[in-house]
């Protein structure tokens, strides 16, 4: 298999390249009876889209979803849902000079070694353009999770370079192009990115995602762990080089008396586990974080080799994000939502007759960040 499909009971397959005629996905396993219309995809797709601000790629795509199958008279039918988005703003000529060169830090070299051929236009299949369809598929998952279980999945930029939020408000996140939780810092972020763009360099970032309302019991032990599948899904996002669940790598310096999440009849007293213990949800907010590397497409010259093995200097033209993390929150939300829906369907299939167990400990403190 080509590993273009993920999920078990909810299986999502994506297809298409950055500069091809279209990108698309097939969602197999969505229960019937969910109301779904093409216009419902617009909000999240615009949140992910390039061209939202001067701090992202200038490529502007309409990202209009065509529902090809799986929906009849506004309701899902239980059959595969096929979605298609036409590419309309490709500029393939920008990549003519690097068609035979390997851009450092990109998948050019590894795709060439694996397949013996590659599509150099905008990165082809390895482009973040592919994540558009993950976000589209997650529109279905988010709606089903919210209606069926009251689950919400929200993400935000929690670090830009060395800059961290100095405050937090969910309401601030959707009111600025950075998905930043502290509105007072946005002007400083604007100035930082303006200077970075003028320098021709790029920078990394961190994104946090919080899923609230997840019932205790979702997930599986050992090989189907909820945190394991979340980590795999998030690592499948372009440019992600690290994933944390809850306290994550901070756990290495904690004592057991600090890290353990004490329980009372009124709820948990902390959430260092990030809402998952033993691969199974505790009922607390699920907290995951990803680290994204700096964009490797730079207009600054760098050393590389071409397909003949000769040393060359590469300068990448085209339209690129100076920080891919700025558009990553909707993508990270999407992967979390798709994993949660798949796990919910699997839990219902195996354990639907178990019922609600007692005691069911309230989520308690419901910490936003595991470190708070």
From Swiss-Prot:
InterPro entries the UniProt entry points to: Chorismate_synth, Chorismate_synth_AroC_sf, Chorismate_synthase_CS
The entry's keywords: Amino-acid biosynthesis, Aromatic amino acid biosynthesis, FAD, Flavoprotein, FMN, Lyase, NADP
Pathway entry: Metabolic intermediate biosynthesis; chorismate biosynthesis; chorismate from D-erythrose 4-phosphate and phosphoenolpyruvate: step 7/7
GO biological process, one term: chorismate biosynthetic process
Coiled-coil boundaries: none
Enzyme class: lyase
PANTHER family: CHORISMATE SYNTHASE
Protein name: Chorismate synthase
Species assigned in the record: Xylella fastidiosa (strain Temecula1 / ATCC 700964)
């Amino acid at each position: 298999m080509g590993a273009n499909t993920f999920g078990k009971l909810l299986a999502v397959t994506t297809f298409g390249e950055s500069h091809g005629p279209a990108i698309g996905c097939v969602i197999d396993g969505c229960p019937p009876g969910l109301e779904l219309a093409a216009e419902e995809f617009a909000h999240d797709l615009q949140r992910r889209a390039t061209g939202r601000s001067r701090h992202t790629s200038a490529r502007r795509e309409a990202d209009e979803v065509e529902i090809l199958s799986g929906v009849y008279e506004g309701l899902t039918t239980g059959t595969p849902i096929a979605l298609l988005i036409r590419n309309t703003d490709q500029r393939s000529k920008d990549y003519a000079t690097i068609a035979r060169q390997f851009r450092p830090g990109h998948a050019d070299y590894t795709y060439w070694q694996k397949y013996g051929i590659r599509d150099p236009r905008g990165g082809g299949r390895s482009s973040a353009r592919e994540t558009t369809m993950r976000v589209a598929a997650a529109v279905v998952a988010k709606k089903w999770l919210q209606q069926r279980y009251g689950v919400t999945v929200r993400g935000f930029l929690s670090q830009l370079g060395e800059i961290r939020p100095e405050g937090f408000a969910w309401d601030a996140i959707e009111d600025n192009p950075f998905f930043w939780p502290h509105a007072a810092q946005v002007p400083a972020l604007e100035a930082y990115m303006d200077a970075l763009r003028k320098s021709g360099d790029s920078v990394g970032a961190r994104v946090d995602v919080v899923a609230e309302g997840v019932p205790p019991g979702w997930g599986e032990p050992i090989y189907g762990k909820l945190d394991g599948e979340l980590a795999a899904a998030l690592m499948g996002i372009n440019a992600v080089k690290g994933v944390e669940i809850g306290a994550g790598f901070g756990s290495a310096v904690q004592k057991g008396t600090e890290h353990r999440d004490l329980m009372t009849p009124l709820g948990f007293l902390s959430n260092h586990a990030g809402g998952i213990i033993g691969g199974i949800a505790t009922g607390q907010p699920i907290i995951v974080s990803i680290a994204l590397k700096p964009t490797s497409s730079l207009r600054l010259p760098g050393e590389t080799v071409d397909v003949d093995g000769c040393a060359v200097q590469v300068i990448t033209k085209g339209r690129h994000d100076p920080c891919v993390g700025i558009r990553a929150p909707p993508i990270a939300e999407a992967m979390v939502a798709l994993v949660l829906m798949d796990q919910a369907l699997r839990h219902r299939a195996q354990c639907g007759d178990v019922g609600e167990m007692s005691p069911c400990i309230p989520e308690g403190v419901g910490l936003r960040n595991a470190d708070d």
